[in-house]
Amino acid sequence: IAPDDGRDLVVKHMVPRRQSPHPTFGTLPKATLKDEAFMLDRLRQTGVVPVPDVVHVAPDLLILTFVDCDQEALSNTGQTALADVLAALHIHTAARFGFDRPTPVGPVQRPNAWSEDWLSFLRDQRLMFFGHLAQQAGRLPDGCFAGLEKLCTQLDRWIPMNRPPSLIHGDLWIGNILFRQQRLAALIDPATYYADAEIELAFLPLFSGVGAAFFERYHAHRPIDPLFFEERQMLYQLEPLLAHAMFFGGGYGTRVHQIVRHYGG
């Protein structure tokens, strides 16, 4: 829409949730657009992440400034620009892992109870949270959930205990990364929380198309442990793949099972 002051705006309206074919989803807490506005504000407060301005917010209504963009795929220039922003974002830290409120993932809310222990946070509020939902919805192959449970008891084999909390965007697929004339115009639709920054690095190649140009630039700002690529990248991809398996089934559940078996689950 274009109001009298000349600004172009985007209006997001949350319609009532339709009955899900999987009863599990209907029992979950509902996400609200106030959560999205809160997360956009948290990213804006860092001073390093371009985000749209919030003009008005209500539980089921969010009005944002329109961000003009012209790029659907990440060029090498775009990847380095994204790396600059994320490296600066990941410097922002907290005393614990989690966030002030749950964060929306599709129509459900992902828990973010504060925890001093990254491994227990990852196990309970990410892998097992989505694993239970995907299993209850019938989206996982036979034996996959049992393997996931076993894997979750052994996370310390691959993930160090001393990972620091970093503020992450949390949902960086290509549609949430907006460019204009080779410059990063905005990051939108966040699912923000404080996590091991490597979980964001693992997510990016799945759905955004980043490659060597991104990782080389990010590494120049914040050195990436070689063991991330060798041991942890696939492990950290389990959470988004479990979420996609929960919603869509199909090959996502198969890929989850492959990763679980790769780690001995």
Language model region names:
Residues 1-120:
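ATP-binding pocket architecture of kinase catalytic cores
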Residues 16-17, 57-61, 69-71, 127, ...:
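Short, solvent-exposed loop/turn segments at secondary-structure junctions
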Residues 33, 79-82, 144, 148, ...:
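Hydrophobic packing residues in well-ordered alpha-helices of helical domains and bundles
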Residues 38-45, 65, 84, 88, ...:
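Residue-level signal for well-ordered alpha-helical scaffold segments within enzymatic catalytic domains
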Residues 48, 91-95, 127, 160, ...:
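Generic structural signal for secondary-structure transition and capping sites
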Residues 93-167, 180, 220:
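An alpha-helical support segment within catalytic cores of ATP-dependent transferases
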Residues 111-112, 116-123, 132, 164-167, ...:
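Active-site Asp-x-Gly
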